[in-house]
Amino acid sequence: MVVKVKQKIPLKIKRMGINGEGIGFYQKTLVFVPGALKGEDIFCQITAVKRNFAEAKLLMVNKASKNRVKPACSVYETCGGCQIMHLAYPKQLDFKDDVIRQALKKFKPTGYEQFEIRPTLGMKKPDHYRAKLQFQLRSFGGTVKAGLFSQGSHRLVPIDNCLVQDQLTQDIINKITQLVDKYKLPIYNERKIAGIRTIMVRKAQASDQVQIIVVSSKEVRLARFIGELTKAFPQVKTVALNSNCSKSSEIYGDETEILWGQEAIHEEVLDYGFALSPRTFYQLNPQQTEVLYGEVVKALDVGSKDHIIDAYCGVGSIGFAFAGKVKSVRGMDIISEAIEDAQKNAKAMGFDNAYYEAGKAEDIIPKWYKQGYRADAIIVDPPRTGLDDKLLKTILHYQPKQMVYVSCNTSTLARDLVQLTKVYDVHYIQSVDMFPHTARTEAVVKLQKRV
């Protein structure tokens, strides 16, 4: 390496990396610079030197890109929650198309150069879209603040006005910090592993109902806190306590108890209503979830004689879009609370052809096949880690005729397509901008078994 830590260098940014950073070459050394844009001439300082590349901090933009904009967020450069707010929104969508291409080029699944990559579907108003927040609580000079850890650190950045957060959820978390201060509730101490560490606030777009989870290392007295909070915000319908005594960075512990209110809030997507209990997963951008699930519906050509497996089904929201038009829908999820919600939701909607079971897809699917169940199509919506190796082998063994892969991580998607394209043809990839101003995107992939 010809560069050293703390060295200041000029740099021409040639392209954007998958995490939104600018990439340039300094005397044949690859340099990653967060905050820099393609085409810019910058001045930066080396912060880390690795075996094959270096990382740098942006000091000055000598020649700015015409696509650079001033972020409206006051904590954008310190928070780390968003990575590309300084890039004009239409160009953010182009960037996300390119991220998919970069991932495919890296992993090279069969036929990737001929894949149809459709333009990313964006939002008309890409602000205040997050219907869920998970903020950490810490004490600053005796005053309680809520926010996010700065990227790569345990330094909390207080946030009282997040540009991408739903305004009601932001107002509620601001009130919560005031009440935690007022009632002297214990704040998390990393050394003692004690106190309130995280607050989750989620709003259902269809009903404006709100649920809250207080994550604490031990039981805390919240009666007066709950009384004043629910009086100030009647939209709050559920307050739950999650016990987490772990030293790890895991947000939640295993036990969640509802302290006040109803068990679930009501949400809707594609004209289907369903219940969400506090610990169940649901997409955090309700507006774009309509778009995303609509693309899943378009991608499957199924009819009244077909059977569908909905892997990683959550509360069943994707499968319900098909339950009224197919012979059966079966789903599974490792979170038992989600399966309980899915079962209740199916019953409430009168879908007696929908069946849900708690457990791992790679264990349950072979069991169903041994019992005689044959899926014509499978939908997978895995976490960022992608498909489990055992599940990949299971899919390739049983080979449903159609498959839709919903991905929230283009790298693991491209990796999994290396295996899937041994049996399936990729008809197209349609990305949906679920997370404006971040480097992340969601993609719907239509696959058909090769004849």
UniProtKB/Swiss-Prot annotation:
Q: Which UniProt keywords apply?
A: 4Fe-4S, Iron, Iron-sulfur, Metal-binding, Methyltransferase, S-adenosyl-L-methionine, Transferase
Write out the GO MF terms.
Answer: 4 iron, 4 sulfur cluster binding; metal ion binding; rRNA (uridine-C5-)-methyltransferase activity
What are the binding positions for S-adenosyl-L-methionine in this chain?
Answer: Q283, Y312, D333, D381
InterPro entries for the chain? MeTrfase_TrmA_AS, MeTrfase_TrmA_CS, NA-bd_OB-fold, SAM-dependent_MTases_sf, TRAM_dom, U5_MeTrfase_fam
Its EC number(s): 2.1.1.-
Q: Which residues cross the membrane?
A: none
Task: List, in alphabetical order, the GO biological process terms annotated in this UniProt record.
Answer: rRNA base methylation
One short Pfam name that applies is TRAM
Q: Which CDD domains match?
A: AdoMet_MTases
Q: What name has this protein been given in UniProt?
A: Uncharacterized RNA methyltransferase spyM18_1615
What organism does the UniProt record list as the source? Streptococcus pyogenes serotype M18 (strain MGAS8232)
